[in-house]
Amino acid sequence: MNNLIMLVTNAVTLSEAAGGLFDFNATLPLQALQFILLTVLLTFIFYKPIGKLLEERETFISNNLAEASAKLLKADELCEQYETQLKEAKTGAQDVIAKAESEAKGIVAQEITQARADAASLIAQTNKELEAQKKLALQQLETQIDELSQLIKEKLLGKVVL
């Protein structure tokens, strides 16, 4: 272990003595080349697939948003159409109800007029019958009065003549 520590301290002292922290020898261009290769490899292996996935996701989201917007517009149109149809149906129903009410009122008025006419006719007929019965009763009474007065005369005259 002591040997390892010694080696590290010797390497540090040698690097400080040779050029300091940045040595411009063959390792610097090699490290730059490694960095460029790592960047290229990461670009092809990691960044491009992730970029492609992100692009696909963005396309998917934008397509879904466009589709949802189209469906929302269609739903709004259908809603307006159904509301219009509902208003028309309500108006039609109100017209039918108003027409039925007016027909019913007309029928009721006609029936009332007919009933009044029938009642007036019945009253007139009853009055005629009562008048006819009254005349008949008066004639019968007159006949009976005449008969009774004749009887009274005969009795009175018959007693007076005796």
Curated annotation (Swiss-Prot):
<dbReference type="InterPro" id="IPR005864">
    <property type="entry name" value="ATP_synth_F0_bsu_bac"/>
</dbReference>
<keyword id="KW-0150">Chloroplast</keyword>
<dbReference type="Pfam" id="PF00430">
    <property type="entry name" value="ATP-synt_B"/>
</dbReference>
<comment type="similarity">
    <text>Belongs to the ATPase B chain family.</text>
</comment>
<dbReference type="InterPro" id="IPR050059">
    <property type="entry name" value="ATP_synthase_B_chain"/>
</dbReference>
<keyword id="KW-0406">Ion transport</keyword>
<keyword id="KW-0472">Membrane</keyword>
<keyword id="KW-0813">Transport</keyword>
<keyword id="KW-0138">CF(0)</keyword>
<comment type="function">
    <text>F(1)F(0) ATP synthase produces ATP from ADP in the presence of a proton or sodium gradient. F-type ATPases consist of two structural domains, F(1) containing the extramembraneous catalytic core and F(0) containing the membrane proton channel, linked together by a central stalk and a peripheral stalk. During catalysis, ATP synthesis in the catalytic domain of F(1) is coupled via a rotary mechanism of the central stalk subunits to proton translocation.</text>
</comment>
<keyword id="KW-1133">Transmembrane helix</keyword>
<comment type="function">
    <text>Component of the F(0) channel, it forms part of the peripheral stalk, linking F(1) to F(0). The b'-subunit is a diverged and duplicated form of b found in plants and photosynthetic bacteria.</text>
</comment>
<dbReference type="InterPro" id="IPR028987">
    <property type="entry name" value="ATP_synth_B-like_membr_sf"/>
</dbReference>
<keyword id="KW-0375">Hydrogen ion transport</keyword>
<dbReference type="GO" id="GO:0046933">
    <property type="term" value="F:proton-transporting ATP synthase activity, rotational mechanism"/>
</dbReference>
<dbReference type="InterPro" id="IPR034679">
    <property type="entry name" value="ATP_synth_b"/>
</dbReference>
<keyword id="KW-0793">Thylakoid</keyword>
<dbReference type="GO" id="GO:0045259">
    <property type="term" value="C:proton-transporting ATP synthase complex"/>
</dbReference>
<keyword id="KW-0066">ATP synthesis</keyword>
<dbReference type="GO" id="GO:0009535">
    <property type="term" value="C:chloroplast thylakoid membrane"/>
</dbReference>
<comment type="subunit">
    <text>F-type ATPases have 2 components, F(1) - the catalytic core - and F(0) - the membrane proton channel. F(1) has five subunits: alpha(3), beta(3), gamma(1), delta(1), epsilon(1). F(0) has four main subunits: a(1), b(1), b'(1) and c(10-14). The alpha and beta chains form an alternating ring which encloses part of the gamma chain. F(1) is attached to F(0) by a central stalk formed by the gamma and epsilon chains, while a peripheral stalk is formed by the delta, b and b' chains.</text>
</comment>
<keyword id="KW-0934">Plastid</keyword>
<keyword id="KW-0812">Transmembrane</keyword>
<dbReference type="GO" id="GO:0046961">
    <property type="term" value="F:proton-transporting ATPase activity, rotational mechanism"/>
</dbReference>
<dbReference type="InterPro" id="IPR002146">
    <property type="entry name" value="ATP_synth_b/b'su_bac/chlpt"/>
</dbReference>
<protein>
    <recommendedName>
        <fullName>ATP synthase subunit b', chloroplastic</fullName>
    </recommendedName>
</protein>
<feature type="transmembrane region" description="Helical">
    <location>
        <begin position="26"/>
        <end position="46"/>
    </location>
</feature>
